[in-house]
Each structure stands twice: as structure tokens, then as C-alpha cells.
């Protein structure tokens, strides 16, 4: 009975596979949104102000960072928790594929969240005249929380890896 239970529990990791595949649909949606923003910009390129162009650029960078985060979580999560990816050894293989454990993934996700939060905070500051001070304060506090959390996770990971 115990053996059956253990095999069933081990096989249940495959439940995550469609979830990782679902992330690719979100990645596709982000790509559509990215190019939708580009296509909205092109006809108005000479009408748009500098601040609005910078805000749009920051939004596109934000979408790009989120897309990279999705790719990282999708591939590393699949490799760490479901099965190894067999993509061959050609030049198209990502250099970090198969080298990122769950701890490294956690730290990279935290760093990505801080980067995304930084871009969002920069967008808030660029549009500060239209945002109340208390909302700006909350954005800043949330960002600081992300930064401190990422730092703490990295520090704890360093402590556990070195055994100090």
C-alpha cells in the first residue's frame, strides 16, 4: 500500500505540466499586448509627448520583464518539479537550462519582481502629478518590501548554501 501511495504521489508531479504549458498562453497574451501597444504608438509617433513616450517605453519594458520571468519559471519549474527538458544540444539551447535549482529560481524570481516593481515605481514617479501622495507612499512601501524580501531570501539562501 505504501509503495502504491508513493508512486501515485510521485506521478502527481505531472499535474504541474499543464500549468507550465498554461504559462506559455500568458506569454502569448503578453506578446499580443506588447505589439498592440506598438501598433497604437506608430500612427501617433509625432503627436505623442516625450513623457508619454517614456511611460509607454517603461510599460513595454515591464511587459518584457514579466515575459522573461514567465519563461524562467516555466522552464526551470518544469525541469525542477516535473521532468528534464530534452531539447538537444544544438545552439538554440538556453545556457542556464538545467542549471537552475529551486533556490536559484526563487532568487531570480525575487530579483525579477524587484526589477518589475522598480519599473512600475518609475512610471508612478513619471506621472506623479496625477497620483496622490498617499498612493505614491504605498507604492514606495510595497517596493521597499519587495526589495527587503528579495535581499532576505538571497541572504538566507547564502547562509544555507555555505552552512554558516
UniProtKB/Swiss-Prot annotation:
Record-annotated membrane-spanning stretches: 15-35, 53-73, 109-129, 136-156
Entry keyword Cell membrane: yes
Entry membrane topology: Multi-pass membrane protein
Keywords: Cell membrane, Membrane, Transmembrane, Transmembrane helix
Pfam families, per the entry: UPF0114
Positions of disulphide bridges: none
GO cellular component, one term: plasma membrane
InterPro entries, sorted: UPF0114, UPF0114_bac
Cellular localisation: Cell membrane
Record carries keyword Calcium: no
PANTHER family tied to this protein: UPF0114 PROTEIN YQHA
Family per similarity comment: Belongs to the UPF0114 family.
HAMAP family, per the entry: UPF0114
Protein name as catalogued: UPF0114 protein Sbal_0780
Protein source organism: Shewanella baltica (strain OS155 / ATCC BAA-1091)
Upper lineage: Bacteria, Pseudomonadati, Pseudomonadota, Gammaproteobacteria, Alteromonadales
